Amino acid sequence: MATVDRWLLPDGIEEVLPPEAACIEVARRQVLDLFQSWGYEFVVTPHIEYLESLLTGAGSDLDLRTFKVIDPQSGRQMGFRADITPQVARIDAHTLKREGPSRLCYAGSVLHAQPRALSSSRSPIQLGAELYGDASPSSDVEVISLMLAMLQLADVPDVHMDLGHVGIYRGLARAAGLSGEVEQQLFDALQRKAIDEVVALTADLPQELASMLRALVDLCGGREVLDAARDRLAGAPAPVLAALNDLLAIAERLAARFPQLPLYFDLGELRGYHYHTGVVFAVFVPGVGQSIAQGGRYDDIGADFGRARPATGFSTDLKTLVTLGQAEIVLPSGGIWVPDSTDAALWQQVCQLRSEGQRVVQALPGQQASAAREADCDRQLIQHGEHWQVMPLAS
């Protein structure tokens, strides 16, 4: 690499400079305090793990997004975490082994071999919360409400939420007895809302099942979609009706709690189909081409760690949250400039001021008083006899 290129960073990898880094850290603390006030306990997961542990219970998408290296000590393949959610699921299932509901939260950098979308970061700061041990819609309502509280804290404007339930499609596909290949083809067609392909792929199915699978293309829109789904899926198998009832219950409770929140339903939206097992949700804002927070239910993941537990949760990118949020983040400003001196009384005064939460910057040898302004100091310590006093910095 030429000397002139040594400062270049890989595509999608960025450094965060002051004061933006300070804003991100303040926001991180505020959000984690919010999570704690809801009863969520903070956990820290490893940046790198053996690959089989890191990808256990996850879909192929995570495998493709994971940077892989060889451990020089063991010779085994390792991966840098691309998603913290499976790691937290392992903590709940294998390490904590609690019997009742468990609420956990996290915040940390992740690394993506491939970005989520064109021009997006490959080094986001993932932040999220997970609720384990309860399979009821109440848990889904709780984590969605917490996610919305987080967005309110950050003052993200014009939030819209998408809701769906992968159990509706999964139940219909199982009832139809689709092969793995055909199910994947139908899944892809539904994501693109390619009705002609959906019709062709369901042509050999019983008419009632074919009609219900085709209906998923059109069942998208406002609250009226759920009423239409009740009519068009009335003859569906019991698991499908149970999934629809869960989605209805969640939607009603969210509408009551957040009456101003626009809700959009898409029963053909199968985000995370190979990973999620129930309700799926995502938050969008105008002008941003991808979701800014997302989550859902994933009840099967704990089984891969020896203990299946109901689970639901969400995640977001803290950098995106700070960028889009309009909440005023007040950063500490000003400080006290201290001259370069070995005076013992000065050192005691500096220690006392720092213990009180004051920002104190001591001059280094050769630094002039003019450097105080560059260090964002607005006061200085001046010696009066044997004592040092804090005085305004001369302009």
Curated annotation (Swiss-Prot):
Pathway: Amino-acid biosynthesis; L-histidine biosynthesis; L-histidine from 5-phospho-alpha-D-ribose 1-diphosphate: step 1/9. Its main location: cytoplasm. It comes from the Bacteria. It is found in: Cytoplasm. InterPro entries: aa-tRNA-synth_II/BPL/LPL, HisRS-like_core, HisRS/HisZ, HisZ. One of its GO terms (biological process) is L-histidine biosynthetic process. Keywords: Amino-acid biosynthesis, Cytoplasm, Histidine biosynthesis. GO terms for cellular component: cytoplasm. The keyword Amino-acid biosynthesis applies. PANTHER family: HISTIDINE--TRNA LIGASE (PTHR11476:SF7), HISTIDYL-TRNA SYNTHETASE (PTHR11476). Heteromultimer composed of HisG and HisZ subunits. This function is generally fulfilled by the C-terminal part of HisG, which is missing in some bacteria such as this one. Required for the first step of histidine biosynthesis. May allow the feedback regulation of ATP phosphoribosyltransferase activity by histidine. NCBIfam families: hisZ_biosyn_reg (TIGR00443), PRK12292.1-1 (NF008935), PRK12292.1-4 (NF008937), PRK12421.1 (NF009086). This is ATP phosphoribosyltransferase regulatory subunit.
